[in-house]
């Protein structure tokens, strides 16, 4: 499904340079096809804002080549911003009220770095709640990544995340628990997904509220779950969108904080991430005591095997295909005629 460059955005230019198909508005308007309008609520901090745009744009644009995608990127108040990044947002991001007026077929919520143990204390909490409530009544499906899943589960179901003894950080194996779910059709029954989080929500917490767990791992716990109907809200506790170097950059960031005395101990290596040669390289660097300016990031990036990308593409392709099947032809209406909003996949009445 090609992306449509309906607004000027640096991330689209980067993807075009990488060889991804990007349609201009003139060419897109000549194709007699129902486009999909996907909202991307980007809550990520400044350092990861643009990279997160590209990660989700790649997954959307690579899903298939039938429909057209207009991706509407927006954010909400409450996330600390530098003056330069706020200027970028003001120039390139869209306004939620305008999007709510025009309508969206689906929304992706990114994660972010929380500042408080209780998510309700975050400055962006009431603004995110407003988007959740609107989407619940107007959007075919909402897909949440990592911290966004915790926000949604606390808002809709009163489920509070729990602090882990240590950070879950690395790439972990998972197993599909519900092979009949259409989002999991024709994908590997066991696959990898990156995780990077201090907190989690357990299968027991979800099942107690009637929320089906779709994918889970022995080390990582729940990777994917959904709202009781199976589709209106999709929750990932991991990061299927991550690039090859995402965990590497997080490790470098935390190592720099440790060297600056802002963390009490050095970060642990991401689990199941580096090749044996990469693990030796990074241990040699740490033992040498060299400054962060000498961190061998480029060399380490070559020592990462990407084991999650194909499954991530398949998951997003299945999700977007279902959105395309279920959404109304008018973008401001939630479902096509005959679809039960309480059971859009028709699984509950079987």
Curated annotation (Swiss-Prot):
Enzyme class: transferase
Similarity remark: Belongs to the MetA family.
Binding residues annotated for substrate, in chain numbering: 167, 196, 253
Any one cellular-component term (Gene Ontology): cytoplasm
Protein name in the entry: Homoserine O-succinyltransferase
Keyword Amino-acid biosynthesis: yes
Catalytic reaction list: L-homoserine + succinyl-CoA = O-succinyl-L-homoserine + CoA
Record keywords: Acyltransferase, Amino-acid biosynthesis, Cytoplasm, Methionine biosynthesis, Transferase
SUPFAM superfamilies noted in UniProt: Class I glutamine amidotransferase-like (SSF52317)
PANTHER family with a match to the protein in the record: HOMOSERINE O-SUCCINYLTRANSFERASE (PTHR20919:SF0)
């Amino acid at each position: 499904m090609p992306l449509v460059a309906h607004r000027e955005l640096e991330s689209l230019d980067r993807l075009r340079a990488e060889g991804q198909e990007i349609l201009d508005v003139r060419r897109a308007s000549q194709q007699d096809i129902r486009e999909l309008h996907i909202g991307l609520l980007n809550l990520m901090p400044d350092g990861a804002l643009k990279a997160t745009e590209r990660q989700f744009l790649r997954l959307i644009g690579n899903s298939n080549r039938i429909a057209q995608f207009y991706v509407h990127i927006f954010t909400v108040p409450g996330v600390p911003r530098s003056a330069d990044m706020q200027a970028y947002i003001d120039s390139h991001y869209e306004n939620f009220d305008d999007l709510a007026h025009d309508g969206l077929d689906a929304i992706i919520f990114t994660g972010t770095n929380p500042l408080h143990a209780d998510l309700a204390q975050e400055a962006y909490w009431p603004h995110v709640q407003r988007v959740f409530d609107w989407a619940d009544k107007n959007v075919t499906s909402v897909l949440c990544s990592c911290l966004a899943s915790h926000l949604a589960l606390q808002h809709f179901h009163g489920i509070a995340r729990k602090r882990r003894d240590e950070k879950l950080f690395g790439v972990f194996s998972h197993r599909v628990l519900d092979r009949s779910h259409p989002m999991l059709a024709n994908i590997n029954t066991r696959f990898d997904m990156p995780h990077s989080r201090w907190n989690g929500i357990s299968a027991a917490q979800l099942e107690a509220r009637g929320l089906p767990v779709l994918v889970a791992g022995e080390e990582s716990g729940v990777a994917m779950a959904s709202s009781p109907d199976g589709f209106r809200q999709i929750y990932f506790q991991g990061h299927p969108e991550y690039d090859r170097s995402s965990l590497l950059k997080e490790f470098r960031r935390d190592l720099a904080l440790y060297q600056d005395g802002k963390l009490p101990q050095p970060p642990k290596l991401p689990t199941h991430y580096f090749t044996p040669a990469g693990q030796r390289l990074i241990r040699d660097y740490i033992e040498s005591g060299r400054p962060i300016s000498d961190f061998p990031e480029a060399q380490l990036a070559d020592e990462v095997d990407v084991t999650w990308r194909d499954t991530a593409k398949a998951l997003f392709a299945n999700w977007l295909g279902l959105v395309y099947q279920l959404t109304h032809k008018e973008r401001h209406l939630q479902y096509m005629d005959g679809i039960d909003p309480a059971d859009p996949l028709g699984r509950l009445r079987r």
